[in-house]
Design a protein with these regions (language model features):
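Extracytoplasmic/periplasmic solute-binding protein
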Residues: 135, 168-219
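Short, solvent-exposed loop/beta-turn-alpha elements that line the ligand-binding surface or hinge
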Residues: 109-121, 125, 203-232, 282-283, ...
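C-terminal capping/gating helix-and-loop segments adjacent to ligand/active sites or protein-protein/ligand interfaces
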Residues: 47-48, 66, 305, 344-418, ...
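Glycine-centered hinge/linker elements that transmit conformational signals in sensory
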Residues: 173, 215-250
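Hinge/lid segment of periplasmic solute-binding proteins
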Residues: 93-144, 159, 195, 291
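A structural signal for short loop-to-beta-strand junctions that line the ligand-binding cleft
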Residues: 88, 116-151, 180-181, 186, ...
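Extracytoplasmic/periplasmic substrate-recognition and gating elements
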Residues: 58-59, 156, 281-345
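Conserved N-terminal structural module of periplasmic/extracytoplasmic solute-binding proteins
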Residues: 9-10, 18-97, 160, 342, ...
């Protein structure tokens, strides 16, 4: 294990050196080391390097800002912090306050800075930790909805649903006509994760659901598992799967298979962001439309919104006012109208900032939800994805129902543990898994 740890340290050191040389600033490592104002920014995916980095460099051509491709969760940054290498600015997408607790002592609190006043209150309701600090800020929302083949609906005389009852009826009519109602890549953890939150979206947006979520995001210790709430959530998830006519066959459906079924007109609905819908529209000889996710306990409908990224500052920045000002300049670029448009790749942006309008002109069909602020912010605790996959596959395979999910020591409590606990055993296991992938790839 000691040898493996040394291998990983060496590997990460090599990545840092390479990233320094290949960063947007185009400076060598030697040149960077001489500049105390050098700012390191880790972006969670490569597309951000292509979309937002040139814009930021254009605004600040004389500043020494280095952009590096990082990771989609906080584990990498916890490792960097342990070895004294925490970047100045970090971004992730899969995130919850609980995930980032190891980093809390090392991250800056935004609550005392003006930038917080530029956010809608609902956008930050899940971003306070147990000390009422706001160490992370979301940057622009991507609206995830159902994408429906309107032409196919009309061909069979089926109306586009406006509530959950109509959704279930439409699915049954499509099924009776030999059309798969909803093509979904349920072999993927993110789609199983979505099914639980959107199938029971009314529960997550209820007072009980909001209270549970707020407690989950901010608690410093274990979270009390709300049995009554989660029994309803599992029950509505199961109902959604059945009403959508998903079966055990869908357990193995990957993203390519699900996409192809929709593109070929064999399925009436898929899911995705505006950019994906536009891409589909260009490929299909059919009119597409968007359908929000419906509550099963009311006539309300909601957009499932995912922040494009979540951003945090290294606390050490507060010791250097010039670097801190530069870091805020970078953040300002990101939350500006131009920056949000670039981050979202030009289509469909739900602005979380009061001084930047929503950019949904090219995304019709969601006006009511936008005007009513009916937006659900996706819960993205890292380990909740695996728990969701196990739960949905258990329901589809018939190995368990919602009652068994609650009773068994596995899934019901697994959700609580996987959502909220990072045990030393799991940490060790994920480290070994990551290391094995690195070594395999290297060899």
């Amino acid at each position: 294990m000691k040898k493996a740890k040394h291998y990983l340290i060496a590997l990460l050191s090599g990545v840092l050196v390479a990233a320094t040389v290949l960063s947007g600033c185009g400076q060598s490592k030697k040149e960077v080391s001489k500049n105390n104002d050098h700012l390191t920014v880790y972006l969670w995916e490569n597309s951000l390097m292509k979309n937002i980095v040139p814009y930021i460099h254009e605004q600040f051509p004389d500043q020494d800002i280095e952009f590096i491709t990082g990771n989609n969760d906080t584990d990498l940054y916890s490792y960097f912090e342990e070895h004294g290498e925490l970047p100045d600015i970090i971004t992730v997408r899969r995130f919850s306050g609980k995930d980032a607790q190891d980093l809390e002592p090392y991250l800056m609190d935004f609550a005392s800075y003006d930038v917080v006043s530029r956010y809608y209150s609902y956008a930050l309701q899940y971003y306070k930790n147990s000390k009422d600090e706001i160490q992370w800020l979301p940057v622009c929302g991507m609206p995830q909805t159902i994408i429906a083949n309107k032409t196919l609906f009309e061909q069979y005389g089926i109306k586009i649903p406006k509530n959950y009852k109509e959704y279930a009826q439409a699915c049954q009519q499509l099924y009776d006509n030999g059309i798969k109602p909803y093509s979904l890549d349920l072999a993927e953890d993110w789609s199983a994760h979505e099914v639980i939150q959107t199938g029971a979206i009314g529960e997550f947006m209820s007072l009980d659901g909001i209270e549970w979520r707020s407690s989950a995001e901010s608690a410093s210790g274990d979270i009390a598992f709300d049995d009554a709430l989660w029994k309803r959530i599992f029950s509505e998830t199961n109902t959604f799967l059945k009403d959508s006519h998903f079966t055990s066959d869908d357990i193995s459906v990957d993203i390519n298979t699900a996409t192809q079924m929709f593109l070929e007109g064999k399925a009436a609905m898929f899911h995705g962001y505006p950019a994906l819908m536009q891409e589909f529209q260009e490929q299909m000889d059919a009119e597409l439309t968007r359908i929000p996710f419906f509550s099963q306990i009311s006539d309300e409908a909601f957009i499932n919104m995912t922040p494009s990224l979540n951003i945090a500052f290294n606390k050490e920045l507060e010791k250097d006012q010039e670097k801190l000002d530069l870091a805020f300049d970078v953040l300002e670029c990101m939350i500006s109208k131009e920056g949000q448009t670039l981050i979202a790749d030009g289509k469909g942006v739900i602005s979380l900032n009061v001084d930047v309008p929503n950019m949904m002109e090219d995304v019709p069909g969601l006006e009511d939800e936008i005007n009513n602020n009916s937006v659900y912010i996706r819960y993205s605790a890292q380990k909740s994805f695996d728990a969701s996959l196990k739960a949905v596959h258990g329901l589809l395979s018939g190995e368990m129902d919602e009652t068994q999910l609650m009773k068994e020591s596995g899934i019901a409590r697994t959700f609580n543990q996987l959502f909220f606990s990072i045990s030393s055993l799991l940490t060790f296991f994920h480290f070994l898994l990551y290391l094995s992938k690195v070594i395999t790839k290297d060899n």
